[in-house]
Amino acid sequence: MSENQVLIREISLGGRTLTLETGRMAKQASGAVLVTYGETVVLVTATVAKNTRDIDFFPLTVDYEERLYAVGKIPGGFIKREGRPSEKAILSGRLIDRPIRPLFPKHMRNEVQVVATVMSVDQDNAPEIAAMIGASAALHISKIPLKKPIGGVIVGRVDGQFVINPMVRQAENSDMHLVVAGTDDAVMMVEAGAKEVPESEMLEGIMYGHEKVKEIVKFIEDFRTEALGMGLAFEKMEIPEPQFDSNMSEAILTIAEEAIREAVLHCSREKLTKKQREVYMDEVMSGLQEKFLEQFPENPKEVTMLIEKAEKKVVRRIITHDKLRIDGRAIDEIRPISVEVGVLPRTHGTGLFTRGQTQILSVATLGSISEEQILDGLGVEESKRYMHHYNFPPFSTGETKPMRSPGRREIGHGALAERALEPMIPPEEVFPYTIRVVSEAIESNGSTSMGSVCGSTLSLMDAGVPLKAPVAGVAMGLIMEEDQFTVLTDIQGLEDHLGDMDFKVAGSANGVTALQMDIKIPGITREVFEQALEQAHRGRMFILGKMLEVLSTPRAEISVHAPAIIRTSIHPDKIRDIIGPGGKIIKKLVEETGADIDIEDDGRVFIAAVDREKGKRALEIIQSITAEVQVGKLYNGKVTRVTDFGCFVEVIPGVMGLPGKEGLVHISQLAFQRVEKTEDIVKEGEVIAVKAIGYDQQGRLKLSKKEAMRDMGLAPAESTSEQPEKRERRPFSRPKATKE
């Protein structure tokens, strides 16, 4: 790489300028590109190891590194530096990984690492899109053998018009968030969240995005061409194909294909379960292994690879040509479905969803508004009321593995199921709860993420959450053989492993709420998309029907074990009265009632308590603390002090040892007749009726017993009649003395 030359090129993307630069930073990486999009800046590097590894998979790692200095923040906590990647960072890394992985040579075993370091963030220009384009460019100018570059965009739709890479204000009004990545001739990856958008319109969005992707791919191709001429790009390294002895290959494939075909057809005819099929197929495969190792003892690795190649070829050919599946189902048939709700006694809502040998237990928990998740990363600061977490324990597949914290796959599956239900969650004004759903994959044979969507819907409805509409999901598969393809509905584990696509579609009866597509081939066409979406719609409607047979609408009441939330509003100026000095009053209120109390800046108050009576008590206390005495209103108040000039009456009692609201009944307002001594009319501790008649210049409350009696019809007759108008008082003058 040249030490002195720098290549900078730009393209218009979504009405803003995107710039690629190489030759200035990170020159020791195999490929490095600095991407600038608006004021978003991401450095993307691609590095390849010199030596191959003795493994049976391609070791690709994509790391998306968020730096808080990118938005002018210092990390919180004691350490004051970035720690583990956030959930957003993990999802962004997966977003880059998925479209590029199928474009590497099938037999590549050199480790490749792509690192996207987010250095500056402008909220209107998504750093994950800049990182995806940068990863493609960095790989393409390097010696790493990516078959062809990719491009990626976000497609939104505002007022019926598609928008490329919508800005924050546009995204707020968009009914879809569709990430499309692909090459110049095919779509490689789709990730979407939507507000019940019909399949046909989602497809148009995908195709619209792909047209812009083609422009980005051409831009990266031209960037590499210029970089080659400047010594800033390199020729691709060669990855040799594994070579087999032709005699050995022919002997193994001929016999193995026939034996495996008979075994697969037997499994299909008998409709064996996953475990039964695994036992049966293991016997067949082990028998073939032993037979060929006796014949070719010096090539154990090659023997295994050829037998696996035969299995993949046979299973795929049976699906595409015979239209048979290994479990005996039709191409568009869904496995048997079982639905249960209310499974666990003390939880707020549960749904047990079983589809074939995939089983998900989803549990919904309702909490107070204060329990919502605060998202404090590189994006716009916001909070999340609905959370979905997905767990995949090893026993779900009958395996033993260490139990660790959630990995990238679990985080990705959880986010997909969360996205599918998010548009259906009622707003805070309708249902003022924080909601968390945990989906436990307790049995797995494919499509646990879509099972989690179904389980989540059931658990939320069981918890009494008034969803806008129930949601279900189904995973579609694809077998592409030469010029023909077969789309499979509700794929299981083996079909996912041996197939070319995992296309997950979730939504309501009205439209799609989430999409995710992963493929293992260099892209798919519009025709494949159309058929997959059409089959997915039919499958989703079938699954929804099964779910609604068990629970057709959300329960009318939330669980008795869930906190009841009481809402009220106070004047914002009264918030300090509830909080008290140093939070003293609010703490005492929580301790006394056991309720969870949240006060918003605009004066909205949410009281959450499992014990409904304690919640009501907390409401009464808050109303008492914030109550204002209304002028002109009658009150029954307790006489707290008696003085020579009147008495003080508490018209709103104090609570929790706090003083109540009291005012002065002047001695002239105690009775209609003249009062010489206050004690002649009232005694301390006595409860009397008074009327609030106003405030003095110091803001002190003035009360009247006399006016209260008048309003109650207890005034003397003469005092109730209209009084004659008073004559003007003349100055007193003594008559002059006269002389006699």
UniProtKB/Swiss-Prot annotation:
Its cofactor is Mg(2+). Transmembrane segments: none annotated. InterPro entries: ExoRNase_PH_dom1, ExoRNase_PH_dom2, ExoRNase_PH_dom2_sf, KH_dom, KH_dom_type_1, KH_dom_type_1_sf, NA-bd_OB-fold, PNPase. One of its GO terms (cellular component) is cytosol. Residues 707-740 are annotated as: Disordered. Disulfide bonds: none annotated. Its EC number is 2.7.7.8. Residues 723-740 have a biased composition (Basic and acidic residues). It is an enzyme of class 2 (transferase). It is found in: Cytoplasm. GO terms for molecular function: 3'-5'-RNA exonuclease activity; magnesium ion binding; polyribonucleotide nucleotidyltransferase activity; RNA binding. GO terms for biological process: mRNA catabolic process; RNA processing. Residues 632-706 form the S1 motif domain. Residues 563-622 form the KH domain. Mg(2+) binds at residues 496, 502. Keywords: Cytoplasm, Magnesium, Metal-binding, Nucleotidyltransferase, RNA-binding, Transferase. Involved in mRNA degradation. Catalyzes the phosphorolysis of single-stranded polyribonucleotides processively in the 3'- to 5'-direction. NCBIfam families: polynuc_phos, PRK11824.1. This is Polyribonucleotide nucleotidyltransferase. It comes from Desulforamulus reducens (strain ATCC BAA-1160 / DSM 100696 / MI-1) (Desulfotomaculum reducens).
